[in-house]
Swiss-Prot record:
The gene is mntD. The chain crosses the membrane at residues 7-27, 42-62, 63-83, 87-107, 138-158, 174-194, 203-223, 227-247, 253-273. It comes from Bacillus subtilis (strain 168). This is Manganese transport system membrane protein MntD. The complex is probably composed of two ATP-binding proteins (MntB), two transmembrane proteins (MntC and MntD) and a solute-binding protein (MntA). Induction: Repressed by MntR in the presence of manganese. Disulfide bonds: none annotated. Belongs to the ABC-3 integral membrane protein family. It comes from the Bacteria.
Length: 295
């Protein structure tokens, strides 16, 4: 595959992976927790490096997953003690992220690990960091990492679809049915953490938030059924990555930024033209009804 194809494929994997797990966050009104975890995993990455002295992917995954779960646990703990959800997210988010930034500034100055790279990413460099198996170059490391995370997300969603669905729409009913709502919550937070850290090398922590929130939000405007919402969210995320790449090459701007911008374009289109909820669609429907009454 060409460098261009690897970049597009990696971006599509980011969009699809984030779109799937982001759907449940949007349904549970936890979109800002995605923003928090996407930043606090920096502490897990730095911590993994300080403990192991290695930038190997598996250690990053473990550190990020642990920090993501810690973030979710602390937010849940503060909320259970009477702190408002948004305030709890703000306290945990800023505290853990600040600790990560300080540790990175103090101990990570001499390694290929910096704040700007962690936050912004650079998908154009993805094809240069490849994986070799039995002497054969099989492609970019980021691509295969994201592919593995996507497979894991799809498997977990498929196996736990009923539990995820009930817990997202009616947690009290889920508890009454014996579904471990808290366990489901932490499974989803683990999925979010892994998806976020896998996306660091491509779109970065800041821009991955757009992929986690905007495609599911757009899909929610287009359908009320969870299965269709998952499919549409994944499609919008993947389509945004493709459009963003060509838009970026056309204007010679940041590829990651263009991909995130395209999610906004997709959301605006759904907001205006959604068959059931679109602003313009509703206006046209109202005008047609007025004409029918007048006629």
């Amino acid at each position: 595959m060409s460098f261009e194809a690897w970049i597009i494929a990696t971006g599509v994997l980011v969009g699809v992976s984030c779109g799937l797990i982001g759907t449940f966050l949007v349904l549970r009104s936890m979109a800002m927790l995605a923003d928090a975890i996407s930043h606090t995993v920096l502490l897990g990455i730095v911590g993994a490096f300080l403990v192991t002295g290695s930038l190997d992917g598996i250690y990053m995954f473990i550190g990020a997953a642990a920090t993501g779960l810690l973030t979710a646990f602390l937010v849940q703990l503060l909320h259970s003690k009477g702190v408002q959800s948004d305030a709890a997210i703000g306290v945990v988010f800023t505290s853990l992220f600040a600790i990560g930034v300080i540790l990175l500034s103090v101990y990570g100055a001499n390694v290929h690990l910096d704040i700007e790279h962690s936050l912004m990413g650079e998908i154009a460099f993805v094809p240069w960091n490849t994986v070799t198996v039995f002497g054969v170059d099989i492609g970019p490391k980021a691509f295969w990492m994201l592919a593995s995370v996507l497979v894991l997300n799809v498997v977990l969603i498929s196996v736990c679809y009923k539990e995820f669905k009930i817990a997202s729409f009616d947690p009290q009913m889920a508890l009454a049915l014996g579904i471990p709502v808290l366990l489901i919550h932490y499974v989803q937070m683990g999925m979010l953490s892994l998806t976020t850290v896998a996306s660091f090398d491509s779109v970065g922590a800041v821009l991955v938030v757009a992929m986690l929130i905007v495609p599911p939000a757009a899909a929610h405007l287009l359908t009320d059924r969870l299965l269709y919402m998952l499919i549409l969210s994944a499609l919008i995320g993947g389509l945004s990555a493709v459009m963003g790449y060509f838009f970026a090459t056309w204007l010679n701007v940041s590829i990651s930024g263009a991909m995130a911008a395209m999610t906004g374009v997709c959301y605006a289109s759904a907001f205006l033209f959604s068959p059931a909820n679109g602003v313009i669609t509703k206006k046209l429907r109202t005008l047609n009804m007025q004409k029918e009454r007048a006629g």
